[in-house]
Amino acid sequence: MTKDITIVLVDTYAHELSRRAIDITLSRLPCKEVVVFSDRNIFPDGRWIRTNSLTIDDYNLIMLKHLWLHVHTEHALVVQYDGMAAIRDHWDDQFLEYDYIGAIWPWAHHPPNLKVGNGGFSLRSQRLLNLLKDDNVTFRPNLLRNEDLYIGVYYKDWLVSNGVKYPSIELAEKFSHEQFPGYKPSFGFHGSFNVPYYLNDYDSEEFVRYLPNRVSESSQLMALHFLLGGRDELGKLAIELARKEHPNFVDMLKQTAFKAAQESNNPEMLEIIKRI
């Protein structure tokens, strides 16, 4: 059954992966519309909002102040090239009872009432989109850039006072997963490092081949988790492609693996270093 949801993607960077993220999401959850803000028409079956190359501030401004103009369904499902639906059976119509839902933030200094959540793969209601355009919500990139922090932390009290409903931590975890380390089955995910746990071999390989920045820490963690999960061919492919862009990639990867092993207290990660 098609949901009264508009998939929204804003990207002028990872065109092929962005298109695939939309396709994968639609295969898990049929949605009424797709709206793409991009410099290319990467999804002809949707509505294309032509934009120039976007800065991070441009992205945040669109997400906070412009979505209400382009979303005509009850909810918007924000998708990114590394944030998408994954496990169809984990969809729950209860998600639609809330105005904002995304993966919980892992930061220890956030109290429980400020854990929801990540905007990279998130569900947002019309109520929220219309409140965000209010002059009471001011985008101040010199103080705070990430648009999801405006929703989940900075303006949360004001939004709640105007009727915005946030889900429990448990329901947010069922909706999406971002936290590293530690895999939890959920409807969707955000972050390249989660690809090894959520995408099949075909989609994972395409992700690895089209990934724009193969030497970032997130991408390194992705390669490590392919190896950790016994998907050595994909791990080695990720390493091989990254080495073409950065000759010292293996040394960087070993440092990342050592750091991850310490932070997660995972001795298996140390064993992976020997296989690189």
Model-identified regions with their sequence ranges:
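Catalytic core and acceptor-binding pocket of nucleotide-sugar-dependent glycosyltransferases
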Residues: 116-230
